[in-house]
Amino acid sequence: MKRPPPLALTLGDPAGIGPQLAAEAWRRLRHSGEGIFFWLGDPRLVERAVPVTCIATPEEAAAVFADSLPVLPVPCEVEVIPGQPDSRNAAATITSIRQAVEYALAGRAGGVVTNPIAKHVLAAAGFPYPGHTEFLAALCDMPGEEIMMLASPQLRVVPVTVHVSLRRALETLTTERIVQVAEIANAALRRDFGIMSPRLAIAGLNPHAGEHGMMGDEEITIVQPAIDRLRAQGIDCRGPMPPDTMFSDKARPHYDVAICMYHDQALIPLKTLDMEEGVNVTLGLPIIRTSPDHGTAFDIAGPVTETCRADVSSLLAAIWLAGEMSAYREGRGS
């Protein structure tokens, strides 16, 4: 059987815990036979902690992975001081993402796993995107088609509105956007997760899902019409569901993904249930992208040594999920 292409792991912010996580993930996976990846980063950041092999192409990664961390060099502009981000190194962070996406689009990487970035650091360097997701969509020439899923073993959630204020989220919530997000999520569950008959739970916006219009009418005027249109397409969806009960132990087994109306409605339950193994997944793009569901953790960043201070669980989950999604796309899924 042909070996699947390796995953591309990005640098993230070099002053954060990304380099620590890359080294520790390699230690955990090197002998597993799964999750082979190469790191697009500065080898100087990790070479004192783990054996490193600098590679020129992704195709070289698998042959060296058991013995050393494959690094496709992306040098930082100035010295990296752990815990002290420097916008002069933003170019390396951006280049790492750009190259990873190019390899994935060409089929030379099975997917992209992104280490955490600091949005304010990139913004200070003139980066015009609010985050990873929007940049990835632009690189794939599909702006506006991307949606964010947070996934853990216990729950999958997709917010309809994402990185905007709550006031702005309410202003931009439309029937059309709910339908678009649900359609993308439904297709992704089939293609990337092997769920042939996805069950979607559509959250209400207001307390008690509006209580028949007594606590707001968005469920009647916006959400229910979206559900009707989705059902007309043959998509299995239920709702509008009261947000205060749909994440209970009894409710979760009855759906495969929760379509939520705004950011915190989706992320609070997922992070409460499983902060350590939550994975950020970008859906709606031609490439696979996952990311650990945490930030740069500048407060615990330190020199990369043989002992990792950061919890690598979420990154390992992101690598595992990217590998599983790649397998489903190639017809190798379990």
Curated annotation (Swiss-Prot):
The keyword Disulfide bond does not apply. Pathway: Cofactor biosynthesis; pyridoxine 5'-phosphate biosynthesis; pyridoxine 5'-phosphate from D-erythrose 4-phosphate: step 4/5. Its cofactor is Zn(2+); Mg(2+); Co(2+). SUPFAM superfamilies: Isocitrate/Isopropylmalate dehydrogenase-like. One of its GO terms (biological process) is pyridoxal phosphate biosynthetic process. GO terms for cellular component: cytoplasm. It comes from the Bacteria. InterPro entries: PdxA (IPR037510), PdxA_fam (IPR005255). It catalyses: 4-(phosphooxy)-L-threonine + NAD(+) = 3-amino-2-oxopropyl phosphate + CO2 + NADH. PANTHER family: 4-HYDROXYTHREONINE-4-PHOSPHATE DEHYDROGENASE, D-THREONATE 4-PHOSPHATE DEHYDROGENASE. Homodimer. This is 4-hydroxythreonine-4-phosphate dehydrogenase. It comes from Gluconobacter oxydans (strain 621H).
